[in-house]
């Protein structure tokens, strides 16, 4: 502590054991908020005295949907003398989180929303460091993405059969790819009339498919959002609220999916050989590899199959 001229440290530890138990150790930070069924949950705490310091220990058996919010004291200090006389109380922070958690945001986005709100309460000039960490307990959710036709046309049925037999939601990316998928399902491709003005191509619809989008331009935008989500996460409002294909893919991959299966065709689309295009689309594989790496960094399990 530079003010008091003494060495000083607080800590909060949330240790997850086998995805079934959370062990929490806390010293001199605001108490970890726990939400269960969307509401504040008063979990048990045991006080330990170590060298005159009060350490609080907890062991919580996890349930699906549990949310843990850890923070530094810069969060409840937000707004002192500006928005609030005595800062943003932990009870008020709890109310704020109870309001946003049911929307299904990722843990990363929830922590971003909390810190952003603190920044606003500080008048965008924080008087203390505001750090937040959110843990969300959820079940595994498989997701499947079909991107590009196979190099060998004879492999179309095999590729489609493997793709559609997988558990979970199904996303089809690309015009030719969607035509092949529709033919396999015995359905037609319908361009959706409900899309917003955007530099991302419009989505389409195929009965039996959860989302149908354009290919390379859309996936490239998803990669841009993924890189931002791994960093400052400043663009989360765009993809979390957008109605374009890239935003919809982001919500499925970033917020819903835990296990993602890519089915990637190696056929070359002549339309993507245009040297005047602003992005090099010649090697579709690069996009898949780049997106896969981003998703792995988000903690997703990734499997890529090429055809």
Predicted regions and their residues:
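Catalytic core of PPM/PP2C metal-dependent serine/threonine phosphatase domains
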Residues: 1-38, 55, 108-135
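Acidic loop->beta-strand submotif enriched in PP2C/PPM serine/threonine phosphatases
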Residues: 7-11, 42-81
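Beta-strand-turn-beta hairpins that frame and shape the catalytic cleft
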Residues: 18-21, 63-65, 227-229
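Active-site-proximal, acidic helix/loop segment immediately C-terminal to a metal-coordinating Asp/Glu
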Residues: 62, 67-117, 270-277
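Non-transmembrane, aqueous-exposed alpha-helical and coiled segments at domain scale
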Residues: 108, 112, 139-169, 178, ...
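Extended, low-complexity intrinsically disordered regions enriched in serine/proline/glycine/threonine
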Residues: 174-175
